[in-house]
A protein has these predicted regions:
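Active-site metal-binding loops of divalent metal-dependent hydrolases
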Residues: 29, 73, 120
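A diffuse structural propensity rather than consistent per-protein peaks
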Residues: 7-10, 84, 152
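Active-site gating loop/helix substructures
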Residues: 42-110
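Active-site periphery "cap/insert" segments of enzyme catalytic domains
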Residues: 1-60, 78, 114, 124
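Polar/charged alpha-helical tracts
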Residues: 11-14, 18, 90, 94, ...
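SIR2/sirtuin-family catalytic core signature
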Residues: 19-22, 40-43, 56-65, 99-176
Length: 176
């Protein structure tokens, strides 16, 4: 599945790669965003979450050399991927314990003033837990936006009430 081409998302990924952001957290284990950076000859760092393994050292990311971070593993390291419910539980435990996510990445998330969530399945129970964890110590005045025209009213209300995420009723390509 992850090895096949997705020509419909390539223009969107090219646009995302051009954004001046220091961190891009991907919620898929594929390397499509990484390929978009390579195709445009942009400088970047790449890392991925590997449950229950010590975080690798990374340099503090900048807009000129951002960090691309695959939170659900990497397709080239199958054992890092979240493929089953058991993998999901191990992943969540690993994230909650905070041992396998780089200190530099945590500091970047906590210091960030802007977050853009694109295409995340906020209706899934584990996504709510994950967003809570990722933003629990983050700057409370940070602007947080989510683009997805398919959110139902209940999910939008939860996102606004619980996480102060502003839902933008636009298709992802229009939002970017």
């Amino acid at each position: 599945f992850y090895g096949r081409p997705f020509p419909e998302v390539e223009p969107l990924l090219q646009q995302l790669a051009a954004l001046p952001a220091p961190v891009f957290i991907c919620m898929t284990p594929d390397t499509l965003l990484k390929k978009a950076f390579v195709q445009q000859a942009f400088s970047f760092q790449y890392d991925f979450h590997y449950p229950n393994r010590p975080a690798r050292d990374i340099q503090p990311p900048t807009a000129e050399e951002p960090l691309l971070y695959n939170l659900l593993g990497d397709t080239e390291r199958r054992e890092s991927m979240v493929l089953t419910h058991e993998d999901l539980f191990v992943f969540l435990e690993s994230v909650m314990e905070g041992k396998s996510i780089s200190r530099v990445l945590k500091e970047q998330i906590n210091a960030a003033y802007n977050f853009i969530f694109i295409g995340l399945p906020f209706g899934r129970w584990y996504m709510k837990i994950l967003v809570h964890f990722l933003q629990k110590d983050a700057n409370r005045k940070a602007l947080k936006y989510a683009a997805n025209h398919a959110f139902d009213e209940e999910i939008q209300a939860f996102m606004v009430d619980q996480f102060q995420i502003i839902c933008v009723p636009a298709r992802i390509a229009e939002f970017v």
